[in-house]
Amino acid sequence: GLGYGYARELLKRGARVVLTGRTAEGVNDAVQRLTREIPDAADRVVGCVCEIADLDSVQSVWDFGVARFGSIDIWLNNAGFARTGVGFLETTAAEIELMVSANVVGSMNAAQVAIAGFRRQGSVGKLYLTLGGGGATGRVVPGMSVYSTSKRAVKYFADTLIKERKEARDDILIGTISPGVNVTEGLLREMQRVPESRRAQAMKQLNLVGEHVETTTPWIVDRILCDTRQANNITWLTTGRMLGRALSMLFGQKRDVISRYESQRGLT
C-alpha cells in the first residue's frame, strides 16, 4: 500500500523511518520486506503497532521514534479506512464508525501528538495529512458517501491547523497530500463490492485515473523532503495529468493498470 511505498522511498533516500500498522504481524512483515529490498536500511527502519483512533497509542509511536532515533522531523499521517462501492444504506454502522474514527479522529490525534512533539523539540517539523475520495474538492462520488465526508472533514481540519500555525509564526509546517487513486489489494477488494451493473464502468474509470504505488510514492516523497512552504498541497492527479491520460486513451493508447498490478504480483 501507500504507507509501505512511502517508507521504501524514504529509506532509499537515507531517512530513518518508523512505520506503523494495526497488528504486530503486519508491522513485522513490512519491516522484514523493506530490509530485504534495501539491505543497508536494516538499522534505519523500525515498526510499531498503533491504533490511530487512540490518542495514547499515537503518542506511544512518537515516544518510540524519539527513543530510537533521537528526534522526529516529518510525520506523515497515511492511516485511514475506506469502505466504498456501495450506497449509504448498505454501509454498516461499524463501517461508518471505523471510517470516521480512523480518518477524522485519527488525523486529529496525529496532529495533536506531532505538533506538540515538534514544539518540545524546538525544531522545524513537517506534518502531512492525507486527503482523497473527492472530499478535498467537494466532488460527489456515488458509493463514497461516508469516506468522502470523512475526508472533507480532514480538509477543513487541515485548513484550520494551517491558519493556527501561521498565527503562531513557528517553524512547524502543515501540508496535505492528495495521492490520487493507487491500485492496491485493498482497492481491488473494494471494487468487488461495486454492484455488478456498475462494475465494468468503475473498472474503466479506475484504468483512467488509477496509478501504481511504485509510480506515485517516489514523486510524493521527493516533494515532501524539499518542501519549505506552509499549506502546501502535494497533489498527484492534477488536471493536466488527467487530461493527458484522457487524450491518450481517446487516441487509442490502452491503459490497464489493473492487469499490470495483477501480473506483477502473480495474481493472473
Walk through the language-model features, giving the residues of each.
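Canonical Rossmann dinucleotide-binding motif of NAD(H)/NADP(H)-dependent dehydrogenases/reductases
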Residues: 1-18
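The beta1-alpha1 cofactor-binding region of Rossmann-like NAD(H)/NADP(H)-dependent oxidoreductases
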Residues: 25, 49-61, 93
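Substrate-binding pocket helix/loop in short-chain dehydrogenase/reductase
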Residues: 86-88, 95-97
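C-terminal helical subdomain
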Residues: 176, 193-252
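A short, exposed helix-loop element centered on a Lys and neighboring polar residues
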Residues: 111-112, 159
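Catalytic loop of short-chain dehydrogenase/reductase
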Residues: 119-120, 124-167, 181
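Conserved glycine-rich Rossmann-like NAD(P)H-binding loop of the short-chain dehydrogenase/reductase
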Residues: 15-29
